[in-house]
């Protein structure tokens, strides 16, 4: 069973954002699966580390791209949106650090399992209006 399905999150008016969210949801589910396996079988360490690194890189690039577009098109709620991203990355970084430095895989599992609630809320209340705004601004450029 997956933690999150793409159908659970709001659809984006900007296809680029939609695709990024779908890719990220797939990665989140893979990290959860590997972390669960690792908690029972430590031979999965290399796979988990690689997938977690991929997830972190994807989320970081995703947020940077959204922030770049918001700045480019002068989105009024840029600071609030960026702060939400920064807080998510800080929590992800802390969970990852606790695992890597102290072997506490439960920190990763708890973070990953609480993420769907944040993702659903963030996409519905923050990303959706941002995508609508950006799509309109991009259409005006054509």
Language model: regions and residue ranges:
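Small-residue-biased structural context
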Residues: 1-142
């Amino acid at each position: 069973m997956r933690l999150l399905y793409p159908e659970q999150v709001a659809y984006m008016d900007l296809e680029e954002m939609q695709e990024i969210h779908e890719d990220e949801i797939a990665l989140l589910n893979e990290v959860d699966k590997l972390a669960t396996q690792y908690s029972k079988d430590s031979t999965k360490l290399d796979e988990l580390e690689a997938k977690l690194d991929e997830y972190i890189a994807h989320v970081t690039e995703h947020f940077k791209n959204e922030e770049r577009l918001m700045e480019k098109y002068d989105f009024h709620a840029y600071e609030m949106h960026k702060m939400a991203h920064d807080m998510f990355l800080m929590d992800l970084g802390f969970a990852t650090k606790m695992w890597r430095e102290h072997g506490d895989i439960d920190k990763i599992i708890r973070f990953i399992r609480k993420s769907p609630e944040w993702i659903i809320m963030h996409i519905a209340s923050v990303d959706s209006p941002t995508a609508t705004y950006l799509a309109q601004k991009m259409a005006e450029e054509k």
